[in-house]
Swiss-Prot record:
Residues of the active site: 181
Positions contributing to NAD(+) binding: 20, 41, 46, 71, 85-86, 124-126, 149
Molecular functions (GO terms): L-lactate dehydrogenase activity
Pathway: Fermentation; pyruvate fermentation to lactate; (S)-lactate from pyruvate: step 1/1
Record's protein name: L-lactate dehydrogenase
Subcellular localization(s) per the UniProt record: Cytoplasm
Function comment: Catalyzes the conversion of lactate to pyruvate.
Positions that bind substrate: 88, 94, 126-129, 154-157, 235
Chief location bin: cytoplasm
Keywords: Allosteric enzyme, Cytoplasm, NAD, Oxidoreductase, Phosphoprotein
Record note on quaternary structure: Homotetramer.
Organism: Priestia megaterium (Bacillus megaterium)
Pfam (any one): Ldh_1_C
Cellular component terms per the entry's GO annotation: cytoplasm
């Protein structure tokens, strides 16, 4: 099996056409990133309906071939994006989904690989860190070619809330959320900047994490999914846009730094766990994990998050 590959047709296979999968497909068409997009779902009628609906808007978008297919269509895909699985219910944590979705994923990944697929797999289903690890184990693909969406959405939420608070363009806010995509995630205050200026200069204190407004912003970030689920039942637009961003970094060989779920192998002193960290993403998947110089408290938070993920993973998947 190759450790590197050259994109062939810019073909993407989407497994799961629920809220996230269909939103991802719609976003892909609007941004014109791929040439081919195949929608795969156990409910073939649903996949067919989504493909037809999106195709009818093609005169307003960049030309792209979209159809409802089967796992055999993964054979020559550059990227397989998995959004299928049980959804997070109100009051349910992402980790509560483990047992249900591990079983689903074992079947999905085997079907993808049995097609002859030899590209990159991007996992979006929760708990994403654990399911990315399951995907890597079952697929046998090189570590860097199995990526979880990780904390890309949490980081985007964090940057948006900071930009709203300080009244600046969110594209000029540089700050990361690391760790589990879930309750043990944490903000990397020590590297938060606005326009190249450290965040502490905007609030006149070095103890950012103790500043009430900043703590509230992080809590809003961490708990955002719960608030959205309680109001509309599910989150899908934001994560779909995040998945498209990762897709673009892969297909366009961008070498972009994004907070994805990647397998740590000694980085940050942690091994054998997929977790949200900044990483360089290009046509081969994860090119390199960026090791930030964390404060002792931030390092402790990352280790705690990794420990929780390992414990939960080991109970559900060995």
């Amino acid at each position: 099996m190759k450790t590197q590959f050259t994109p062939k047709t810019r073909k993407v296979a989407v497994i799961g056409t629920g809220f996230v999968g269909s939103s991802y497909a719609f976003s892909m068409v609007n941004q014109g990133i791929a040439n081919e997009l195949v929608l795969i779902d156990m409910n073939k009628e649903k996949a067919e309906g989504e493909a037809r609906d999106i195709n009818h808007g093609m005169p307003f978008a960049t030309p792209m071939k979209i159809w409802a297919g089967d796992y055999k269509d993964c054979a020559d895909a550059d990227l397989a994006v998995i959004t299928a699985g049980a959804n997070q219910a109100p009051g349910e944590t992402r980790l509560d989904l483990v047992e249900k979705n591990v079983k689903i994923f074992e079947c999905i990944v085997k079907d993808i690989m049995n097609s002859g697929f030899d590209g990159i797999i991007l996992v979006a289903t929760n708990p994403v860190d654990i399911l990315a690890h399951v995907t890597q184990k079952v697929s046998g693909l090189p570590n860097g070619r199995v990526i979880g969406s990780g904390t890309i959405l949490d980081t985007a939420r964090f940057r948006y809330l900071l930009s709203d608070y300080f009244e600046v363009d969110s594209r000029n806010v540089h700050a990361y959320i690391m760790g589990e995509h879930g309750d043990t995630e944490f903000p990397v205050w020590s590297h938060a900047q606005i326009g190249g200026v450290k965040l502490e200069h905007f609030i006149n204190t070095a103890a950012i994490e103790k500043e009430p407004d900043m703590q509230h912003l992080f809590e809003q970030t961490r708990d955002a999914a719960y608030h959205i689920i309680n109001r509309k039942g599910a989150t899908y637009y934001g994560i779909a846009m995040g998945l498209v961003r990762i897709t673009k970094a892969i297909l366009d060989d961008e070498n972009s730094i994004l907070t994805v779920s990647a397998l740590l192998e000694g980085q940050y002193g942690i091994s054998d766990v997929y977790i949200g960290v900044p990483a360089i993403i290009n046509k081969n998947g994860v090119r390199q994990i960026i090791e930030l110089n964390l404060t002792p408290h931030e390092q402790q938070q990352l280790e705690h998050s990794a420990s929780i993920l390992k414990q939960t993973r080991d109970r559900a998947f060995v």
